């Protein structure tokens, strides 16, 4: 039952689920920007352009002591399956620790 | 002496080999009378100025190069050192051009080591590649030959941008934005269109440990994508990283 639900879950929900389960997070905000990119040359021939481009704002204490690149790599690494499966871009517009937010 | 650019790779190679030198670019159009006049002036200044590279670039023929320097009208003269644009002189104004040469080139010449290689050597030098087949793997899991190629590419210029499309025709919004940001910051950069070579496109994801494009490298070091570069510009960090 759970497995079937997971497979019918959209990419946006899967990203949210993956990040919130793998990281301690104070905040995850995920925006679907796919509609802005569906007409671009690079998207030619892509079968489903509804869930290809997302924008993320994330706050996690686990980012403490990590460089920007390391924070982004951590998030990208957790979502490797999504990138392999058709996620084209995840803009991480903010990746902060709770201390950096306050 | 001044050198006429005849192909893009020649230009990129001169920039790569001339990192320590001051380079003066002359963007011109053969049909424009002011350009004809300024080309003569430019050639004379080139003869009189030692240890600087003077390049003539036909703007319409090399639209990608012209676009990356935001050339809207000719003649346009751009003075660069490393990855930084020192001055832009627009129009047929020999006095302004001479003033820029005196202001920037003469003081800098004393600071930088003169290279033994002449411009001609730089233009004609060919990078030798190992033609023996090499199927061994690099530590990151990439084929050694591809890994070496990516290493060469990421070091091909002080600042190297890997994007979808070209600076004049970016193929995605993120690439377009990053090109715009670099232009605003007057950053001179080399670029590679990853859509033209899938082995580079896929290989660079592993090489950089970064799954998306565009990707920016400075002095062979991975810096980040659009988000990180935007943040670095806001904080003034990017300018600090750029080579002098």
UniProtKB/Swiss-Prot annotation, chain A:
BP terms from Gene Ontology: cell division
Disruption phenotype: Leads to delayed spore germination and the unidirectional cell extension is not followed by cell division. Proliferates faster with smaller cell size than the wild-type cell during vegetative growth, but no other significant cellular anomaly, such as defects in septation or cytokinesis are detected. Sensitive to UV light. Shows a normal cell cycle delay after UV irradiation, but displays aberrant septum formation and defects in cytokinesis when released from the UV damage checkpoint. However, chromosome segregation is not affected.
Function field: Acts as a mitochondrial iron-sulfur (Fe-S) cluster assembly factor that facilitates [4Fe-4S] cluster insertion into a subset of mitochondrial proteins such as lipoyl synthase (LS) and succinate dehydrogenase (SDH). Required during the last step of iron-sulfur protein assembly when the iron-sulfur cluster is inserted into the target protein. Probably acts together with the monothiol glutaredoxin grx5. Not required for [2Fe-2S] cluster insertion into mitochondrial proteins. May be involved in control of cell division, especially during the resumption from cell cycle arrest.
Family matches, as Gene3D superfamilies: BolA-like
Name recorded for this polypeptide: UV-induced protein uvi31
Family of this protein: Belongs to the BolA/IbaG family.
A Pfam family reported for this protein in Swiss-Prot or TrEMBL: BolA
Principal location class: mitochondrion
Curated annotation (Swiss-Prot), chain B:
Keywords: 2Fe-2S, Cytoplasm, Iron, Iron-sulfur, Metal-binding, Nucleus, Redox-active center
Leader sequence residues: none
Iron-sulfur among keywords: yes
Principal location class: cytoplasm
Pfam families for the chain: Glutaredoxin, Thioredoxin
Domain Thioredoxin residue range list: 2-106
Binding locations of [2Fe-2S] cluster: 172
Binding residues for glutathione: 164, 201-205, 226-227
CDD domains, sorted: GRX_PICOT_like, TRX_PICOT
Subcellular location: Cytoplasm; Nucleus
Swiss-Prot/TrEMBL GO biological process terms: intracellular iron ion homeostasis; positive regulation of transcription by RNA polymerase II
GO CC, any one term: cytosol
Domain Glutaredoxin: 147-244
Family (UniProt): Belongs to the glutaredoxin family. Monothiol subfamily.
Subunit structure: Homodimer. Interacts with php4.
Job description of the protein: Monothiol glutaredoxin involved in the biogenesis of iron-sulfur clusters. Binds one iron-sulfur cluster per dimer. The iron-sulfur cluster is bound between subunits, and is complexed by a bound glutathione and a cysteine residue from each subunit.
Listed name of the protein: Monothiol glutaredoxin-4
Gene: grx4
């Amino acid at each position: 039952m759970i497995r079937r639900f997971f497979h019918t879950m959209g990419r946006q929900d899967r990203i949210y689920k993956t990040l919130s389960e793998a990281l301690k997070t104070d905040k995850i905000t995920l925006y679907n920007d796919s509609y802005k990119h569906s007409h671009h040359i690079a998207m030619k021939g892509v079968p489903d352009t509804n869930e290809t481009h997302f924008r993320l704002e994330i706050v996690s204490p686990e980012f403490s002591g990590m460089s920007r690149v390391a924070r982004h790599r951590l998030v990208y690494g957790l979502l490797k399956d999504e990138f392999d499966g058709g996620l084209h871009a995840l803009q991480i517009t903010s990746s902060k620790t709770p201390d950096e937010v306050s | 002496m001044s050198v006429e650019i005849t192909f893009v790779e020649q230009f990129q190679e001169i920039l790569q080999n001339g990192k320590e030198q001051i380079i003066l670019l002359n963007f011109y159009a053969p049909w424009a009378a002011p350009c004809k006049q300024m080309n003569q002036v430019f050639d004379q200044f080139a003869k009189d100025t030692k240890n600087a590279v003077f390049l003539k670039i036909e703007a319409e023929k090399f639209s990608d190069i012209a676009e990356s320097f935001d050339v809207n009208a000719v003649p346009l003269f751009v003075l660069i050192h490393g990855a930084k644009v020192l001055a832009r002189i627009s129009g047929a104004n020999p006095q302004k051009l001479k003033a820029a040469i005196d202001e920037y080139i003469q003081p800098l010449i004393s600071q930088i080591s003169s290279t033994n290689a002449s411009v001609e050597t730089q233009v004609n030098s060919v990078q030798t590649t190992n033609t023996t087949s090499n199927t061994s793997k690099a530590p990151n899991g990439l084929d050694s030959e591809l890994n070496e190629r990516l290493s060469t590419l990421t070091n091909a210029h002080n600042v190297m941008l890997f994007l979808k499309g070209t600076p004049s025709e970016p193929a995605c919004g993120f690439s377009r934005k990053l090109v715009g940001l670099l232009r605003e910051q007057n950053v001179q950069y080399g670029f590679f269109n990853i859509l033209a070579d899938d082995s580079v496109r896929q290989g660079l994801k592993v090489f950089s440990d970064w799954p998306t494009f565009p990707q920016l490298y400075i002095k062979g070091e991975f810096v980040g994508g659009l988000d990180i570069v935007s943040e670095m510009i806001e904080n003034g960090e990017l300018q600090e990283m750029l080579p002098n």
